[in-house]
From Swiss-Prot:
EC number: 1.1.1.290
Entry function: Catalyzes the oxidation of erythronate-4-phosphate to 3-hydroxy-2-oxo-4-phosphonooxybutanoate.
Name of the protein: Erythronate-4-phosphate dehydrogenase
Catalytic activity line of the entry: 4-phospho-D-erythronate + NAD(+) = (R)-3-hydroxy-2-oxo-4-phosphooxybutanoate + NADH + H(+)
Cellular component, GO annotation: cytosol
Amino acid sequence: MKIIADENMPYVDVLFGELGEIEYVNGRTLAPEQLADADVLLVRSVTQVNEALLCQNQQLKFVGSATIGTDHVDTAYLKSRGIPFTNAPGCNATAVGEYAFIAMLELAQRYRQPLKDKKVAVIGAGNTGTATARCLEAYGVEHRLCDPVLAAQGDNRQFYELDELIAWADVISLHVPITKGGDHPTWYLFDQQRLEALKTGAWLLNCCRGEVIDNRALIEVKQRRVDIKLVLDVWEGEPSPMLALVPLVDIATPHIAGYSLEGKARGTFMLYEALCRVMGKTGENSFHSLLPPFFLGSMQVRELGDERALLTLCRTVYDLRDDDIHFRQSGTDRLGFDKMRKNHRHRREFSALKLENAKGSEVNWLSFLGFSNVG
Protein backbone atom coordinates (compact mmCIF):
# COMPACT_ATOMS: atom_id res chain seq x y z
CA MET A 1 0.00 0.00 0.00
CA LYS A 2 1.40 3.40 -1.00
CA ILE A 3 0.93 6.27 1.44
CA ILE A 4 1.48 9.86 0.30
CA ALA A 5 2.06 12.16 3.29
CA ASP A 6 2.77 15.83 3.81
CA GLU A 7 6.46 16.20 4.68
CA ASN A 8 5.63 18.42 7.64
CA MET A 9 3.34 15.92 9.34
CA PRO A 10 5.11 14.40 12.36
CA TYR A 11 5.18 10.79 13.54
CA VAL A 12 4.05 9.40 10.18
CA ASP A 13 6.96 6.94 10.03
CA VAL A 14 6.33 5.62 13.53
CA LEU A 15 2.60 5.22 13.05
CA PHE A 16 2.06 4.39 9.39
CA GLY A 17 5.30 2.55 8.62
CA GLU A 18 3.68 -0.74 9.62
CA LEU A 19 0.81 -0.15 7.19
CA GLY A 20 2.60 0.57 3.92
CA GLU A 21 5.28 2.37 1.91
CA ILE A 22 5.46 6.09 2.73
CA GLU A 23 6.36 8.85 0.28
CA TYR A 24 6.68 12.42 1.58
CA VAL A 25 5.63 15.42 -0.50
CA ASN A 26 5.43 19.19 -0.30
CA GLY A 27 1.79 19.69 0.59
CA ARG A 28 1.60 23.16 -0.91
CA THR A 29 2.87 22.10 -4.35
CA LEU A 30 1.38 18.59 -4.55
CA ALA A 31 0.40 17.73 -8.15
CA PRO A 32 -2.02 15.13 -9.61
CA GLU A 33 0.75 13.01 -11.15
CA GLN A 34 2.31 12.49 -7.72
CA LEU A 35 -0.90 10.79 -6.59
CA ALA A 36 -1.50 8.55 -9.60
CA ASP A 37 -0.75 5.29 -7.76
CA ALA A 38 -1.47 6.34 -4.16
CA ASP A 39 -3.69 4.31 -1.86
CA VAL A 40 -3.66 6.73 1.08
CA LEU A 41 -3.31 10.52 1.17
CA LEU A 42 -2.40 12.37 4.38
CA VAL A 43 -2.53 16.17 4.21
CA ARG A 44 -2.60 19.40 6.20
CA SER A 45 -4.56 22.59 5.53
CA VAL A 46 -2.12 23.81 2.84
CA THR A 47 -3.33 21.14 0.37
CA GLN A 48 -6.55 21.60 -1.61
CA VAL A 49 -8.01 18.11 -1.99
CA ASN A 50 -10.50 18.10 -4.86
CA GLU A 51 -11.29 16.56 -8.23
CA ALA A 52 -8.46 18.46 -9.92
CA LEU A 53 -5.88 17.00 -7.53
CA LEU A 54 -7.21 13.44 -7.68
CA CYS A 55 -8.01 13.31 -11.40
CA GLN A 56 -5.20 10.83 -12.20
CA ASN A 57 -5.92 8.47 -9.31
CA GLN A 58 -8.45 5.64 -9.54
CA GLN A 59 -7.42 3.59 -6.50
CA LEU A 60 -7.42 5.94 -3.52
CA LYS A 61 -8.77 4.20 -0.43
CA PHE A 62 -8.44 6.86 2.28
CA VAL A 63 -7.86 10.60 2.74
CA GLY A 64 -6.92 12.04 6.11
CA SER A 65 -6.31 15.65 7.10
CA ALA A 66 -4.50 16.37 10.37
CA THR A 67 -6.54 19.53 10.86
CA ILE A 68 -9.54 20.79 12.77
CA GLY A 69 -11.17 22.34 9.70
CA THR A 70 -12.15 20.80 6.38
CA ASP A 71 -12.54 23.88 4.15
CA HIS A 72 -9.55 22.70 2.07
CA VAL A 73 -11.19 19.34 1.26
CA ASP A 74 -14.02 18.73 -1.22
CA THR A 75 -15.78 16.22 1.00
CA ALA A 76 -18.73 15.92 -1.37
CA TYR A 77 -16.41 14.82 -4.17
CA LEU A 78 -14.70 12.24 -1.95
CA LYS A 79 -18.10 10.91 -0.92
CA SER A 80 -19.19 10.65 -4.56
CA ARG A 81 -16.18 8.41 -5.21
CA GLY A 82 -16.68 6.39 -2.06
CA ILE A 83 -13.35 7.46 -0.58
CA PRO A 84 -13.36 7.46 3.25
CA PHE A 85 -12.26 10.77 4.74
CA THR A 86 -11.42 11.86 8.25
CA ASN A 87 -9.96 14.96 9.81
CA ALA A 88 -8.79 15.56 13.36
CA PRO A 89 -11.30 17.82 15.11
CA GLY A 90 -9.98 19.11 18.38
CA CYS A 91 -6.47 17.75 17.87
CA ASN A 92 -4.80 21.10 18.52
CA ALA A 93 -7.58 22.85 20.43
CA THR A 94 -5.67 22.81 23.71
CA ALA A 95 -2.59 24.30 22.04
CA VAL A 96 -4.61 27.12 20.47
CA GLY A 97 -6.39 27.88 23.72
CA GLU A 98 -3.10 28.02 25.62
CA TYR A 99 -1.53 30.20 22.89
CA ALA A 100 -4.37 32.72 23.18
CA PHE A 101 -4.18 32.71 26.97
CA ILE A 102 -0.39 33.16 27.01
CA ALA A 103 -0.68 35.97 24.44
CA MET A 104 -3.15 37.77 26.70
CA LEU A 105 -0.77 37.39 29.64
CA GLU A 106 2.08 38.76 27.52
CA LEU A 107 0.05 41.84 26.57
CA ALA A 108 -1.03 42.28 30.18
CA GLN A 109 2.60 42.28 31.30
CA ARG A 110 3.81 44.50 28.46
CA TYR A 111 1.19 47.19 28.99
CA ARG A 112 0.78 46.76 32.77
CA GLN A 113 -2.92 45.98 32.43
CA PRO A 114 -3.82 42.86 34.46
CA LEU A 115 -5.72 40.24 32.51
CA LYS A 116 -7.84 39.63 35.61
CA ASP A 117 -9.29 43.13 35.11
CA LYS A 118 -10.29 42.52 31.49
CA LYS A 119 -13.57 41.42 29.94
CA VAL A 120 -12.91 38.89 27.17
CA ALA A 121 -15.14 37.96 24.23
CA VAL A 122 -14.47 34.57 22.65
CA ILE A 123 -15.87 34.59 19.12
CA GLY A 124 -16.48 31.01 18.04
CA ALA A 125 -17.20 28.40 20.71
CA GLY A 126 -16.08 25.24 18.95
CA ASN A 127 -13.03 23.26 20.01
CA THR A 128 -10.45 26.07 20.08
CA GLY A 129 -12.81 28.71 21.43
CA THR A 130 -13.92 26.38 24.19
CA ALA A 131 -10.28 25.63 25.06
CA THR A 132 -9.58 29.36 25.30
CA ALA A 133 -12.63 29.88 27.50
CA ARG A 134 -11.49 27.00 29.71
CA CYS A 135 -8.19 28.78 30.40
CA LEU A 136 -9.99 32.03 31.18
CA GLU A 137 -12.41 30.19 33.46
CA ALA A 138 -9.55 28.52 35.33
CA TYR A 139 -7.89 31.87 35.96
CA GLY A 140 -11.15 33.61 36.87
CA VAL A 141 -11.33 36.05 33.94
CA GLU A 142 -14.77 37.38 33.01
CA HIS A 143 -15.63 36.20 29.53
CA ARG A 144 -18.55 35.73 27.16
CA LEU A 145 -19.12 33.55 24.11
CA CYS A 146 -20.47 34.31 20.65
CA ASP A 147 -21.43 31.49 18.30
CA PRO A 148 -24.72 31.88 16.40
CA VAL A 149 -24.24 28.55 14.63
CA LEU A 150 -23.96 26.56 17.85
CA ALA A 151 -26.76 28.60 19.40
CA ALA A 152 -29.05 27.66 16.51
CA GLN A 153 -28.08 24.01 16.95
CA GLY A 154 -29.29 24.04 20.55
CA ASP A 155 -26.02 24.38 22.46
CA ASN A 156 -27.16 25.27 25.97
CA ARG A 157 -24.33 27.64 26.83
CA GLN A 158 -25.14 31.34 27.02
CA PHE A 159 -24.25 33.19 23.83
CA TYR A 160 -24.21 36.89 22.96
CA GLU A 161 -24.53 38.86 19.73
CA LEU A 162 -21.25 39.81 18.06
CA ASP A 163 -21.79 43.56 17.90
CA GLU A 164 -22.97 43.56 21.50
CA LEU A 165 -19.69 41.91 22.51
CA ILE A 166 -17.58 44.29 20.45
CA ALA A 167 -19.06 47.15 22.48
CA TRP A 168 -18.58 45.23 25.76
CA ALA A 169 -15.21 43.51 25.47
CA ASP A 170 -11.74 44.74 26.33
CA VAL A 171 -10.28 41.66 24.62
CA ILE A 172 -11.63 39.81 21.57
CA SER A 173 -10.26 36.38 20.64
CA LEU A 174 -11.32 34.91 17.28
CA HIS A 175 -11.88 31.16 16.86
CA VAL A 176 -14.28 30.71 13.93
CA PRO A 177 -14.01 28.63 10.75
CA ILE A 178 -13.79 30.49 7.45
CA THR A 179 -17.09 30.52 5.56
CA LYS A 180 -18.41 32.67 2.72
CA GLY A 181 -21.99 31.41 2.56
CA GLY A 182 -24.82 30.49 4.87
CA ASP A 183 -26.56 32.58 7.50
CA HIS A 184 -23.37 33.49 9.35
CA PRO A 185 -20.45 33.98 6.94
CA THR A 186 -17.11 34.70 8.59
CA TRP A 187 -15.11 35.97 5.60
CA TYR A 188 -14.17 39.54 6.61
CA LEU A 189 -16.28 39.14 9.73
CA PHE A 190 -14.20 41.98 11.10
CA ASP A 191 -14.44 44.54 8.32
CA GLN A 192 -13.60 48.22 8.54
CA GLN A 193 -16.84 49.05 10.33
CA ARG A 194 -16.34 46.48 13.09
CA LEU A 195 -12.66 47.32 13.46
CA GLU A 196 -13.59 50.96 13.93
CA ALA A 197 -16.12 49.90 16.59
CA LEU A 198 -13.49 48.30 18.85
CA LYS A 199 -13.33 49.84 22.30
CA THR A 200 -10.52 52.24 23.11
CA GLY A 201 -7.50 50.16 24.07
CA ALA A 202 -9.05 46.90 22.88
CA TRP A 203 -6.93 43.79 22.30
CA LEU A 204 -7.77 41.78 19.17
CA LEU A 205 -6.43 38.23 18.76
CA ASN A 206 -6.85 36.08 15.65
CA CYS A 207 -5.95 32.40 15.95
CA CYS A 208 -8.32 30.95 13.34
CA ARG A 209 -8.13 32.10 9.70
CA GLY A 210 -6.52 35.23 8.30
CA GLU A 211 -9.47 36.25 6.15
CA VAL A 212 -11.76 36.53 9.17
CA ILE A 213 -10.25 40.04 9.41
CA ASP A 214 -9.99 42.37 6.43
CA ASN A 215 -6.23 42.87 6.70
CA ARG A 216 -6.11 45.97 4.48
CA ALA A 217 -8.78 47.60 6.62
CA LEU A 218 -6.86 46.52 9.71
CA ILE A 219 -3.73 48.30 8.47
CA GLU A 220 -5.70 51.48 7.84
CA VAL A 221 -7.48 51.40 11.21
CA LYS A 222 -4.38 50.45 13.21
CA GLN A 223 -2.32 53.25 11.64
CA ARG A 224 -4.84 55.71 13.05
CA ARG A 225 -5.66 53.90 16.28
CA VAL A 226 -2.47 53.03 18.10
CA ASP A 227 -4.57 52.21 21.16
CA ILE A 228 -5.60 48.86 19.63
CA LYS A 229 -3.29 45.95 20.48
CA LEU A 230 -3.00 43.06 18.02
CA VAL A 231 -2.03 39.40 18.22
CA LEU A 232 -2.06 37.70 14.83
CA ASP A 233 -1.15 34.08 14.24
CA VAL A 234 -3.01 33.97 10.91
CA TRP A 235 -2.84 36.31 7.94
CA GLU A 236 -4.78 37.11 4.84
CA GLY A 237 -2.86 35.76 1.84
CA GLU A 238 -0.77 33.20 3.74
CA PRO A 239 2.04 32.32 3.37
CA SER A 240 2.71 35.87 2.19
CA PRO A 241 1.32 38.27 4.81
CA MET A 242 0.93 41.94 4.00
CA LEU A 243 4.30 43.32 5.02
CA ALA A 244 2.82 46.67 6.06
CA LEU A 245 0.76 44.89 8.71
CA VAL A 246 3.51 42.99 10.54
CA PRO A 247 5.15 46.01 12.26
CA LEU A 248 1.72 47.10 13.52
CA VAL A 249 1.15 43.82 15.36
CA ASP A 250 2.20 43.34 18.99
CA ILE A 251 2.64 39.56 18.77
CA ALA A 252 3.07 38.02 15.32
CA THR A 253 3.52 34.34 14.43
CA PRO A 254 3.14 32.21 11.25
CA HIS A 255 0.00 30.13 11.89
CA ILE A 256 1.56 28.01 14.64
CA ALA A 257 -0.89 28.56 17.51
CA GLY A 258 -1.90 24.91 17.31
CA TYR A 259 1.62 23.61 16.70
CA SER A 260 2.36 21.88 19.98
CA LEU A 261 4.05 18.48 19.95
CA GLU A 262 0.94 17.13 21.67
CA GLY A 263 -1.37 18.69 19.08
CA LYS A 264 0.65 17.46 16.13
CA ALA A 265 0.95 13.98 17.56
CA ARG A 266 -2.75 13.92 18.40
CA GLY A 267 -3.69 14.92 14.84
CA THR A 268 -1.54 12.27 13.17
CA PHE A 269 -2.63 9.65 15.69
CA MET A 270 -6.31 10.33 14.99
CA LEU A 271 -5.69 9.67 11.29
CA TYR A 272 -3.78 6.49 12.14
CA GLU A 273 -6.68 5.22 14.23
CA ALA A 274 -9.16 6.05 11.46
CA LEU A 275 -7.12 4.26 8.78
CA CYS A 276 -6.76 1.21 11.02
CA ARG A 277 -10.55 1.11 11.35
CA VAL A 278 -11.00 1.37 7.58
CA MET A 279 -8.53 -1.49 7.11
CA GLY A 280 -10.08 -3.56 9.89
CA LYS A 281 -6.80 -3.60 11.80
CA THR A 282 -5.94 -3.10 15.45
CA GLY A 283 -3.31 -0.39 15.82
CA GLU A 284 -0.11 -1.39 17.58
CA ASN A 285 0.92 2.13 18.65
CA SER A 286 -0.21 4.35 21.53
CA PHE A 287 -0.47 8.13 21.63
CA HIS A 288 1.62 8.71 24.76
CA SER A 289 4.50 6.63 23.40
CA LEU A 290 5.03 9.29 20.72
CA LEU A 291 5.85 12.17 23.08
CA PRO A 292 9.38 12.83 24.38
CA PRO A 293 9.84 13.59 28.09
CA PHE A 294 9.69 17.27 29.06
CA PHE A 295 13.05 18.87 29.85
CA LEU A 296 11.89 19.37 33.46
CA GLY A 297 10.82 16.29 35.36
CA SER A 298 8.66 18.34 37.71
CA MET A 299 8.48 21.70 39.48
CA GLN A 300 7.39 22.75 42.95
CA VAL A 301 4.85 25.58 42.90
CA ARG A 302 3.21 26.35 46.23
CA GLU A 303 2.05 29.87 45.45
CA LEU A 304 1.88 32.43 42.68
CA GLY A 305 2.43 35.93 44.00
CA ASP A 306 1.02 37.81 41.02
CA GLU A 307 0.22 37.62 37.33
CA ARG A 308 3.87 37.99 36.41
CA ALA A 309 4.60 34.76 38.30
CA LEU A 310 1.86 33.00 36.33
CA LEU A 311 3.34 34.25 33.06
CA THR A 312 6.80 33.06 34.14
CA LEU A 313 5.36 29.61 34.81
CA CYS A 314 3.68 29.56 31.40
CA ARG A 315 6.91 30.68 29.72
CA THR A 316 8.63 27.66 31.26
CA VAL A 317 6.49 25.54 28.96
CA TYR A 318 6.20 27.90 25.98
CA ASP A 319 7.79 31.32 25.56
CA LEU A 320 5.74 32.97 22.84
CA ARG A 321 8.21 35.84 22.55
CA ASP A 322 10.73 33.55 20.84
CA ASP A 323 8.37 32.76 17.97
CA ASP A 324 7.43 36.43 17.61
CA ILE A 325 11.09 37.44 17.30
CA HIS A 326 11.91 34.62 14.89
CA PHE A 327 8.93 35.44 12.68
CA ARG A 328 9.86 39.11 12.37
CA GLN A 329 13.47 38.22 11.57
CA SER A 330 12.94 35.51 8.97
CA GLY A 331 9.32 34.40 8.60
CA THR A 332 7.50 37.19 6.81
CA ASP A 333 8.14 36.05 3.24
CA ARG A 334 6.65 32.96 1.62
CA LEU A 335 9.66 30.70 2.08
CA GLY A 336 10.41 31.87 5.60
CA PHE A 337 6.78 31.50 6.67
CA ASP A 338 6.61 27.87 5.57
CA LYS A 339 10.11 27.06 6.82
CA MET A 340 9.27 28.31 10.29
CA ARG A 341 6.10 26.22 10.36
CA LYS A 342 8.00 23.16 9.14
CA ASN A 343 10.71 23.51 11.78
CA HIS A 344 8.41 24.39 14.67
CA ARG A 345 9.04 21.36 16.90
CA HIS A 346 9.78 22.81 20.34
CA ARG A 347 6.34 23.76 21.61
CA ARG A 348 4.73 21.82 24.45
CA GLU A 349 1.38 22.12 26.20
CA PHE A 350 0.92 22.94 29.90
CA SER A 351 0.27 19.26 30.63
CA ALA A 352 3.93 18.48 29.87
CA LEU A 353 4.96 20.15 33.13
CA LYS A 354 4.22 18.28 36.35
CA LEU A 355 3.64 20.38 39.46
CA GLU A 356 4.59 18.88 42.81
CA ASN A 357 2.67 19.42 46.04
CA ALA A 358 0.04 21.60 44.36
CA LYS A 359 -2.96 19.55 45.50
CA GLY A 360 -4.79 21.23 48.33
CA SER A 361 -2.71 24.40 47.99
CA GLU A 362 -3.80 27.81 46.74
CA VAL A 363 -2.49 26.94 43.26
CA ASN A 364 -4.56 23.79 42.87
CA TRP A 365 -6.48 25.66 40.14
CA LEU A 366 -3.45 25.28 37.87
CA SER A 367 -4.61 21.74 37.16
CA PHE A 368 -7.74 23.24 35.59
CA LEU A 369 -5.50 25.44 33.48
CA GLY A 370 -3.89 22.26 32.16
CA PHE A 371 -0.76 21.63 34.21
CA SER A 372 -0.21 18.09 35.43
CA ASN A 373 -0.59 17.65 39.18
CA VAL A 374 1.49 14.96 40.84
CA GLY A 375 0.41 15.61 44.42
